[in-house]
Amino acid sequence: MVDITAAELKAAEAIFGDRLELAERYVEHLATSGTERGLIGPREVPRLWSRHVLNCAVIEREIARGSHVADVGSGAGLPGLCLAIARPDLELTLIEPLERRVIWLQEVVDDLGLTNVTVMRTRAELAVGMVNADVVTARAVSALSNLAGLTIPLLGGKGEVVAIKGRSAGEEIEKAAKAIRKLGGVQTSVVVVGEDLLEEPTTVVRIIVNKSQKIA
């Protein structure tokens, strides 16, 4: 079993509530078959809770109830599966092009009994028209200048992108500003989430999209 500190447990209880056991089982999948199949590096196992699962799950605060969320480049389910566990009211579509990752994701979804998750084996750009999400999430996929083109089209003209980023978030926004506006982004901001729960809060770039709204 993966060790969890008192601080991590407190945060996990606050985020996952009565679904904490599901989160613990997910972490065990990451630590075992996830590392065996190359989805998570072995060195990451001691910090799965803080650096990965809690870092991702806390962004549920930024997502409205009942939203359809598309997670681009879902990989090991970060943040997609974290959100599905923390928020059973959400409908999750995990978009992942690599077969071995898709197989692993589906195995975990089945084992945890997550009825609010669909796993799609495809590239994000090929999912346009098949997916019409309210919110699109991503973590460690690519720079925002490229990520905007992979995420915004999945919103069907209106919605939000919530991308987990690092300290360079502001700089990435500056470089991607033109592309974001062209795609229908009307407001882009950096939001720090989980300062009251996490030792290292999560930084996200939030893009509000509305193609029908004219940008000055």
From Swiss-Prot:
Leading EC class: transferase
InterPro entries: rRNA_ssu_MeTfrase_G, SAM-dependent_MTases_sf
Localization terms from the record: Cytoplasm
EC annotation from Swiss-Prot or TrEMBL: 2.1.1.-
Binding site for S-adenosyl-L-methionine: G73, L78, A124, E125, R139
Gene Ontology CC, one term: cytosol
Alphabetical list of PANTHER family matching this protein: S-ADENOSYL-L-METHIONINE-DEPENDENT METHYLTRANSFERASES SUPERFAMILY PROTEIN (PTHR31760:SF0)
Family indicated by similarity: Belongs to the methyltransferase superfamily. RNA methyltransferase RsmG family.
Known role: Specifically methylates the N7 position of guanine in position 518 of 16S rRNA.
Identification of the protein by name: Ribosomal RNA small subunit methyltransferase G
Gene: rsmG
